[in-house]
């Protein structure tokens, strides 16, 4: 058990330092707190992370996905192939357009969409594939993109957890028709709240800009139906500060993950897989537990090690998706998704961890042995 003098090692540790506070105060004193010069500067700087693609800042990662799908013309009558092993926002963004979600299974040796399962899920109504770069590991874009190209489908990347992740040197958010990033406080970098759309298509970017601002480019000259999904200058100012620290934070995450990989030896625990050519940025360090996961988590918590399950219920088993499918008689056979949801546990990997913290994590995990 944790001693009275030991604090729990948290599974996540968002950073809001003096530089972020100073940046916010400067914006507040300027009087221009809504979308303005800070947002434009943040968009320009973020483009360097995605091979110079056009960036459009919005108010959340979910909005980024939603607006990107809308800008691509996806809506009622269309289908989008999505992994069920993800946060619900991936599927919610599709449903909000009026399109239908078609779930495909994940790979048995990873957490991303299985290209073979995607191929099998495609129908004449399929308009897009949405790979999710879950936990900071790139999906199999080298195999998914050719499927989309051959079938004439858009690729919409959910990169909300994967800032600076890459596959064979190409950054996520730069593969498909567009990508979506999140700046929620627990992400590898944050903007308090916010999101970013990335695309190489100027017309698509313009449509997203219209959609985020009530359909307007010029004030009161509405061109299309839109909404208020703008990022504020307050959020953008925080994002710009965090962006300057992202590289160092990411290398610390990767170093922490390497330490855990090298020192976790418990037979019941499988460390995160990394595909050949993949740059994993470890938004989460997610292991698989063989045996009684609840007992293992309780033991870790008792030892003062923060832990969490992302995500305990696959999307296809959540009420908004499960009940309609039961009414229509459609059933999803996603064995690898269900298996992962039963086995995964995320451990601390964030850049604020000390050497002592890492040693405590390893000691607690290895104490699980063969049978948690």
Task: List the model feature ranges, each with a label.
Residues 32-79, 92-97, 103-105, 170:
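Phosphate-binding glycine-rich loop
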